[in-house]
């Protein structure tokens, strides 16, 4: 990686992107262009290949398009590659129109997800910066409020910040009564009391990240409780190849519960999680290779999507990737 950093300008001059290719758990380093078989005992988890920048971007997007055409009845939502198997819940509809803002209530969290792309802190550690962050976001809301249709309430874990959530929602609703709010949660604290608190605030949509606790049954029970209380219930998880089997194993249960939508996020690699993902083949070079495509994550999205269509599950499956904004990395 240091060698790549030192030679970055030289690579750009040659119109070449040095691509770090994902290591797959089968022992194959996969790229849309070639498969490189490596011994299971080989400790090298990535390989660097010279690749023309334009070819890489075009070829990967073409490969995603080929995955899409294998799935009948996909809905296209804008000029890019945002797709779903059915109609979107209101929060996602608003997002595709770029009419929403993300409101981070705090940085504290009670989970420790290896894939989390945000800087979060333990639930028992107070952080004065949280207050200043919320104040800055309220100012941003007032600057943009005329154009906004919805606000997503995130963290950290929002259910650790219920007083702040209530105050923030009340402030924004005072100036924009018709706003649609949706809350993200890892589901650990989603008991009847807290869910009832959110419903009483007029929250119309809740999203569970089941991957945070590796799809444990007690979180599925909390999800089922939420289904009885909210108009829109979404499961939103990263397409994380390491957890693919766990996700596939609970799809039938999600259909029984009656969720409205399964959002499959593209796995994001940032300075907050690269140290946890390095051992799985995701390398910190991603931070300066601006156009790297996490192809394995996108491929998993369409494999799961196709399976859900073939099984006839009632919920919409949505590809929530960076492509929906027409940009990458």
Regions found by a protein language model. Give the residues of each.
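Distinct, well-ordered alpha-helical segments
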Residues: 163-170, 191-199, 218-222, 247
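Flexible, acidic/Gly-rich N-terminal and inter-domain linker regions that tether
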Residues: 1-102, 111
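Core AdoMet radical
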Residues: 120-132, 144-161, 175-190, 201-219, ...
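Canonical Radical SAM [4Fe-4S] cluster-binding loop centered on the CxxxCxxC motif
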Residues: 90-132
